[in-house]
């Protein structure tokens, strides 16, 4: 066994699996590699290959968005029936953990919060609470679900908020953890209104 060749195969295979290439015909894949390495005439042009790959990735993404949205809708449906959960007309859901007695922020305000964000499977994607560092941001500079819910929260409140994908990052997702079409869950603690 040539270790370098095998290691390259492992690396490429791992990348393919991580990228969602689950429909690869190994014989055709190896034929493409062989044609390039042996200088043979390819069975399609490089431009055609780019189009095929791009179309495939778009379809993989479309399916992922659809699956994530369906899972999120099912989660919201079940969550909405839990005691203490309020569903707003926008689809945003919240549950009061602690109700504060301070003022409510307005759209032009900047707020200081603690938050803990998870996917519906419980995987943490971001947490100021875990970092031990509050976050400050303008209400107009966050996802729609945050903008909406923070204007309902009195300072001093701590709420569990479930945000449908269209009020979160929508079909674009965010980073590696938040896939397109993801419903998000946050524990949000509104600490202060820090300015306009």
Language-model segments: which ranges?
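Cross-family detector of peptidyl-prolyl cis-trans isomerase
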Residues: 1-196
């Amino acid at each position: 066994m040539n270790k370098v060749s095998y290691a390259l195969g492992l690396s490429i295979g791992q990348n393919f699996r991580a990228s969602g290439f689950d429909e690869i015909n190994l014989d055709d894949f190896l034929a493409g590699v062989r044609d390039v390495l042996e200088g043979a005439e390819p069975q399609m042009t490089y431009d055609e290959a780019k189009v095929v790959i791009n179309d495939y990735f778009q379809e993989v993404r479309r399916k992922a968005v659809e699956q994530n949205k369906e899972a999120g809708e099912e989660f919201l449906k079940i969550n909405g029936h839990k005691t203490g959960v309020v569903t707003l007309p926008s689809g945003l859901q919240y549950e009061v953990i602690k109700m504060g007695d301070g003022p409510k922020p307005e759209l032009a305000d900047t707020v200081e919060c603690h938050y803990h964000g998870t996917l519906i499977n419980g995987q943490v994607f971001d947490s100021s609470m875990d970092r031990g560092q509050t976050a400050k941001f303008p209400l107009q500079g966050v996802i729609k679900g945050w903008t909406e819910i923070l204007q309902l929260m009195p300072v001093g409140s701590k709420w569990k908020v479930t945000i449908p994908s269209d009020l979160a990052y929508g079909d674009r997702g965010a980073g590696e953890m938040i896939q397109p079409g993801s419903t998000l869950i946050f524990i949000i603690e509104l600490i202060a209104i820090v300015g306009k």
